A protein has these predicted regions:
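Cap/insert and terminal regions of metallo-dependent hydrolase folds
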Residues: 134, 142-175
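A short helix-to-beta-strand connector/capping loop
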Residues: 61, 85-91, 105-107
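Core dinuclear metal-dependent hydrolase active-site scaffold
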Residues: 1-25, 92-153
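Short, well-ordered alpha-helix to beta-strand connector turns
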Residues: 34, 87-89, 158, 165
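A short, active-site helix/loop in glycosyltransferases that binds the activated sugar's phosphate group
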Residues: 70-80
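Active-site flanking residues adjacent to catalytic metal/cofactor-binding acidic residues
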Residues: 12, 40, 138-139, 163-165
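Active-site metal-binding motif and surrounding structural segment of the metallo-beta-lactamase
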Residues: 7-11, 15-66, 159
């Protein structure tokens, strides 16, 4: 998420390959500096890149990490993530489902719950409003039928929709 008027930028999820995320960001904006991370849930592909913010790698100072309550508790109570909080490499910003917050004067986010395996945290998508355009970002979701929201109707209401499409059908991974 980039605000071209203020040059602020945020990423959704910190993947295990956060280095690649930051390189991609730099290729588009000229800088890897981020103003925050919006987490969706506590599965490895979505938050483990936070470890790079610690003293062993980037040694960041107070990067805002936006997370739902259970996700925030997970980070506070489990190492090595708890060290990021204790050493103030990250600053947890607790979110509430269906409540809008301003990232800055031009960008608003609203997390909303989606059905997924919630062993360690809730799972959220985001509605993001930038000036007059609205987009949704939906991460992993188990089954559309489990969600009380009609995805077709939701997509009709926004300008852009980004849906995680890692797997098309069950069984694609041999286990």
């Amino acid at each position: 998420i980039v605000d071209p008027t203020t040059n602020e930028q945020w990423i959704i999820d910190a993947t295990p390959n956060i280095k690649k995320q930051l390189q991609l960001l730099k290729s588009k904006t000229g800088t890897e500096k981020i103003d925050g991370v919006l987490l969706t849930h506590a599965h490895m592909g979505h938050y483990t890149g936070l470890m790079h913010f610690g003293r062993e790698v980037m040694g960041t100072n107070g990067i805002p990490v936006f997370a739902m309550p259970k996700m925030a508790i997970f980070l506070e109570e489990n190492g090595p993530w708890s060290q990021l909080v204790e050493l103030e490499n990250i600053s947890l910003q607790k979110l509430k489902s269906d409540s809008t917050i301003n990232l800055n004067e031009n960008i608003k986010i609203k997390p909303f719950l989606v059905p997924h395996r919630d062993e360690f945290s809730e799972t959220v998508g985001y509605e993001i409003t930038i000036n007059r355009k609205t987009l949704i970002f939906i991460p992993d979701i188990d089954k559309w039928e489990k969600w009380e929201t009609n995805i077709t109707e939701l997509i009709k209401k926004v300008d852009y929709a980004f849906l995680d499409a890692t797997f098309y059908k069950n069984g694609e991974l041999k286990r």
